[in-house]
Regions:
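Solvent-exposed loop/turn and edge beta-strand elements of beta-rich ligand-binding domains
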Residues: 1-313
Length: 313
């Protein structure tokens, strides 16, 4: 017995069936036909790089009425298989993602997949990795006495290093005229921002603090408001000596000069006003300095312009 044609939803039974017929007897033979079936192979990948497979993504398989037929989870290769479904009963199925990798955006779109007779239907799902940016707003912490910037003024040309959660360098960003610097697209997670030495902006102090920012949602821009203290050059001069004297007596004054500002001083000038009708300067002593650098000392009186007293001290 050879089957030549069968029902629409069934596979033809191509196996010849041997039937033994006995005289004056009716022989009954059962011939089975399998329903035409199909299943789906799901592959979860990174949207930008299909070589990256996503494991432990959870999905549901539903019928056209929204009934959940089974639940799936991708393996280490980002793959999972549905059961085999009869085409007669389920000509199409729907796939819904319920949980994805924490670094990726959940795909909420319901996928409609048409089954094919006696085939495994391959379906690739893409997931968008979560990206965000960090926006640094750099302003003056106080009024700047050197350049006249008021408190809150944007500071240009300040550079920052951007680092990942393991403190690995990612990129360098620099503020524009508006005091704003913004990173490129960064993956979800905690990032660190630190001002780069020597690039804190003209007339401003380096901010040595490390700042953190966490990117949680796709497309978000996390703002960091960071301030810098202005450079504040300043010196303190103490004058010690006798208060009263008699005519023609030599008097001596000692000056203690200290840097009380927040920047090194390349040069500075101090003044001492004496009554010229009563006093004549006779000697200037260079003094003692506590930094091992070269010094040049100039002096000026009411009788002459600046003159070099000592060089290369």
């Amino acid at each position: 017995l050879i089957e030549e044609e069968t029902g629409k939803w069934y596979n033809l039974n191509e196996n010849p069936i041997e039937i033994k017929i006995n005289w004056n007897e009716t022989t009954n033979t059962t011939v089975e036909n399998e329903l035409k079936k199909s299943q789906i192979k799901i592959i979860k990948v990174d949207k930008e790089n299909h070589e990256v497979k996503l494991k432990d993504v959870e999905l549901e398989v539903l019928d056209k009425d929204g009934n959940v037929l089974e639940k799936l989870k991708t393996d280490k290769n980002g793959e999972c298989y549905t059961k085999r479904y009869a085409i007669r009963d389920y000509p199409e199925l729907y796939i819904r993602e319920t949980k994805t990798n924490e670094k990726y955006v959940l795909d909420t779109e319901m996928k409609k997949i048409t089954l094919k007779e006696n085939e495994i239907v391959n379906y690739t799902f893409e997931n968008q990795k979560i990206y965000g940016q960090i926006k640094v707003i750099k302003t003056s912490e106080e009024d700047n006495k050197i350049n006249g910037d008021k408190k809150g003024t944007p500071i240009p040309n300040v550079s920052f290093g951007v680092y990942d959660e393991n403190k690995n360098f990612i990129e360098k960003i620099t503020t524009g005229a508006d005091g704003i610097a913004i990173t490129s697209k960064l993956e979800k997670g905690t990032k660190y921002i630190k001002e780069l030495e020597g690039e804190s902006g003209e007339w401003y102090q380096l901010n040595e603090n490390e700042y953190s920012a966490e990117i949680v949602k796709h497309g978000e821009i996390v703002e960091l408001n960071i301030t810098n203290k202005p450079d504040n050059p300043n010196i303190d001069v103490e004058k010690d000596g006798i208060i009263q004297t008699t005519a023609n007596q030599e008097i001596k004054y000692d000056f203690t000069i200290g840097n009380i500002g927040n920047v090194p001083l390349n040069n500075f000038t101090w003044y001492d006003y004496l009554p010229t009708e009563y006093v004549t300067a006779t000697k200037l002593v260079t003094g003692t300095y506590n930094q091992d650098i070269d010094y040049a000392i100039y002096y000026k009186t009411n009788k002459n312009d600046y003159r070099l007293l000592r060089d290369n001290l």
